[in-house]
Amino acid sequence: MSEPNTPLHAQPNEQLDLNNLNDLDEKDIDDLNLDPNSDVEISADSGDVVNSNIDNVIWQRNCNKKRRYHTPEFNDVYNETNNTINDVTMLDDVDDFQPRINVSSPFSSATKLSELLPNDHNGTSHPRRLSMSQQSKFISYVDDQLLQIQRKFVQSRGLNIKNGYASLTPLLQDLKTLVDFVWYSIAHVPNSDYLLQSEEKRHCPDSRNPKDTCGYSSYFGQGSYLIKIADDLIDYVEKFTFKNMEDSEINDTLSKLFKLFFILDRIFVILTDDNDNCKEVPKTSSASKNIAGLNGTDIVRLKGIAERTRVRLPIFLESQGIHGYHYELSKIYEGFLDHANSF
């Protein structure tokens, strides 16, 4: 096979005449065949052969992809098409974008949401701020609980499996209990499950008059603990596996996981709203000294955590062979990010 000549190129200032172009002769076409021993014969009509090969490769890749994402019943219907591309098979399952969990249900099935609604502190006084001694005890207790959770998590990685977390569910329950404790110190509500309800069905601190909320504050920086929990949560989740679990167990675990994300999101929205609502209070007012909520540094730090979680969690679920839950994934920290980006 002779080496083809280098084609002539137009000069820098030369205008090409696109209507006067020479076609390739048979010798040039033969020179294009880099594998003369191949059974594929390149000719002037070789475009049909190339397109056919490309279509076969694309079809095979799509076929393998669909077998991974769909049920056996779907694959049977898919194979009966005799390699005829159907518009339905080229689309994602509609069910993957529908809610998989009942967001309004409590984190624990034994909890009754009707018993968790705030009682407006009996309609008398605002939540009492903790004294310095109480704040010190609070900090010591939360630090100890975070350390206990971290220690049990490390033990479950192989050091002492019996004393560690056997699965992700008990870890989520411990984190949820700690979130409830921290939230109680802020809102004086014993269980944060009521935040899963719609705005119309709950009465929480952020629904009060901003002028009323700015006059007092039981917040002394507890948000930093909630931010740490949110930061550690995705790191904990990625160390567990779902591959040997039943479908019902997977759904139950993911239900608790998403609800914990939604509760944290709602709390962060409330703490962010408190800062925003209190802007109405004059700076000379004594109430402005007791504004409750996340500061600018907390918000910037939390934005990075929220965006990182929204990226890493779908990747982790896909690595575990779990598909769907697109609706729940799209709602993770959605409320907080909307508020934070509006500043």
Curated annotation (Swiss-Prot):
Q: Which GO terms describe its biological process?
A: nucleotide-excision repair; transcription initiation at RNA polymerase II promoter
Cellular localisation:
Cytoplasm; Nucleus
Task: Give the sites modified to Phosphothreonine.
Answer: 71, 84
Q: Which Pfam families match?
A: TFB6
List the signal peptide residues: none
One GO cellular component assignment for this chain's record is: nucleus
Chief location: cytoplasm
- Keywords, sorted A to Z: Cytoplasm, Nucleus, Phosphoprotein, Transcription, Transcription regulation
Gene deleted: what happens?
A: Prevents the dissociation of SSL2 from TFIIH after transcrition initiation.
Q: Which residues carry this modification: Phosphoserine?
A: 104-105, 108, 342
In-chain residues carrying the UniProt-annotated modification Phosphotyrosine: 69
Q: What induces it?
A: Expression is positively regulated by ARG5,6.
Asked if the keyword Transcription belongs to this entry, the reply reads yes
Q: How is it modified after translation?
A: Phosphorylation leads the dissociation of from SSL2.
Task: Share any extra remarks.
Answer: Present with 3510 molecules/cell in log phase SD medium.
- What is the recorded function of this protein according to its Swiss-Prot or TrEMBL entry? Component of the general transcription and DNA repair factor IIH (TFIIH) core complex, which is involved in general and transcription-coupled nucleotide excision repair (NER) of damaged DNA and, when complexed to TFIIK, in RNA transcription by RNA polymerase II. In NER, TFIIH acts by opening DNA around the lesion to allow the excision of the damaged oligonucleotide and its replacement by a new DNA fragment. In transcription, TFIIH has an essential role in transcription initiation.
Query: Sorted alphabetically, which PANTHER family does this protein's record hold?
Result: ADR380WP (PTHR37781:SF1), TFIIH COMPLEX SUBUNIT (PTHR37781)
The entry describes its oligomerization and partners as: Component of the general transcription factor TFIIH, composed of a 7-subunit TFIIH core complex composed of XPB/SSL2, XPD/RAD3, SSL1, TFB1, TFB2, TFB4 and TFB5 which is active in NER; the 3-subunit CTD-kinase module TFIIK composed of CCL1, KIN28, and TFB3 which is active in transcription; as well as TFB6 that regulates SSL2 association with the complex.
The molecule here is called: General transcription and DNA repair factor IIH subunit TFB6
